[in-house]
Amino acid sequence: MQLLNFGLLLLPFVAGDLAPQPEPLLAGPSDVVPGQYIVTLKEGLTSAQIRDHKKWVSSVHRANLDSFAAGASGVETEGIMKHFHIHDLNMYSGGFDEKTVEDLSRNPYVKSVHPDQHVYLAKTVTQRQARWGLGYMSSKGKPVPLHSTLVDYSYDDKAGEGVWAYVLDTGINVNHIEFEGRAILGHNAIPNKPHTDEFGHGTYVAGIIAGKTYGVAKKANVVSAKAFDTGSSTYNYILETYDWIVRNITDSNRKNKAVINLSISGAKYQPFDDAVEKAFKAGITTVVAAGNDGKDAKNNTPASSPNAITVGAVRWENTRPSFSNYGKLVDIWAPGELIKSCWKGGNNATSTQSGTSAASPHVAGLVAYLMSIENLPSPSAVTARVLNLTIPNLVKDAKDSPNRVAYNGIQERKFKLPK
């Protein structure tokens, strides 16, 4: 069974150290959660079959707990914990002894059994610099001055109005002045923790999507879906949160007016790739970070999910930062180095960060922006429109990636030159 190295995707900088390209800050070591698993059921099962399967699991688990073999494992297990249903994909998490896991792997209703994983956040530090990313999004990929705050960002004034961006992350400070009351608390999967953002990552990502100053879609609504806290998470919480998002979008009739942002990445983990794919088939668009390993994104989740919009990071002069993943599964490139946005610590706090965590929300914001001004009835239509607007062949060292830079479709762009 495959171990997972998984984390949020911002990189630290020392204040004032702007010239060197950064090395990626790797997330902490990823460990299997002892005795805890994600079970994926085969497609086509009826509700009755799923109910019968769960009864069977409970019976087998109880019997094994009573046996010497289960007791000898030294792991307390609690059986089925949570069920996830995304389109026609059914999964559940659970705490099981080794004998029950063996029985599950042989069950005719079970597609796969994967160990749950600890998921670690990358640490970041603050740097007060840069607003180049927004100007780049409306400049057809023309190089922009890194330190200038005088670059125009041109956009349609609908600016994401009526669209909902769901941010699966560390939470959002919904009271930050950048959100102007357009940010709401959605779901908090972390037990015994308040629905706040003590780490800063989720607030930062949301600011790039929809902040009044730093956002691509300045009138979009953002929904906080908390699956991480200040330390780590597991797929038990990530799948719960993603399942909630898909249900909320569906129940609220927002499929063609909603986008999910996942600024997270780790070693390939098929159950979550499957979940993202099923959301696409259900009519929901997901934008994901390519990852910060400086390697081919095909080995990362959720970047390898075939119908997610996978985003690599580009610098202001159209080069690929050394940290950004690449490859044939990277659909598009967007600003991802020295990007300023909202931060933790106060309702007007800001920070400048780098990583594909910053690139992904630029494209999620672009999706929200386009949804507000055009009739894009499906994720396929959204992806086609986003890619159709891109500017080709600009990124240096794109490796074998599709060489397409994000662009919002506005033709005019001006520089205000200082006197």
From Swiss-Prot:
InterPro entries assigned to the protein according to its UniProt record, in alphabetical order: PCSK9_ProteinaseK-like, Peptidase_S8/S53_dom, Peptidase_S8/S53_dom_sf, Peptidase_S8_Asp-AS, Peptidase_S8_His-AS, Peptidase_S8_Ser-AS, Peptidase_S8_subtilisin-like, Peptidase_S8_subtilisin-rel
EC annotation from Swiss-Prot or TrEMBL: 3.4.21.-
GO CC entries: extracellular region
Protein's UniProt keywords contain Glycoprotein: yes
Domain Inhibitor I9: 36-122
Domain Peptidase S8: 131-419
Glycosylation sites noted in the Swiss-Prot or TrEMBL record: 248, 261, 348, 388
CDD domains: Peptidases_S8_PCSK9_ProteinaseK_like
GO BP terms in the entry: proteolysis
Superkingdom of the organism of origin: Eukaryota
Name this protein carries in UniProt: Subtilisin-like protease 2
